Amino acid sequence: LGILCKKDGMSYEAFRNHWLNVHAVLCCKLPKMRRYSVNFVDRARFPKFGYDGFSELWFDSEADLEAAFKSPEGQTLLADLPNFTSVISPIIAVETQVMWP
């Protein structure tokens, strides 16, 4: 997971636009990534929530994740972060399926 705050002075719309139309395109080029999703905080319902959104990047292993970020595509992706976010809190989690359709 990557939990993000928009860049200081950037509108929420510009943040959302950059993430979806620039950063997500770069992210989808990561080698061995199986799934990617972007989730935005509903500002109408949670105007004071401390973050603006989070992403989920799915890999088969932590080794695949590390290799992806060390790749040229990963380095390009990381270099784009300051263009739209001031804070990113990365979390590595392992999914435990409790109920799955």
Residue ranges and their predicted role:
Residues 1-101:
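Macromolecular interaction modules
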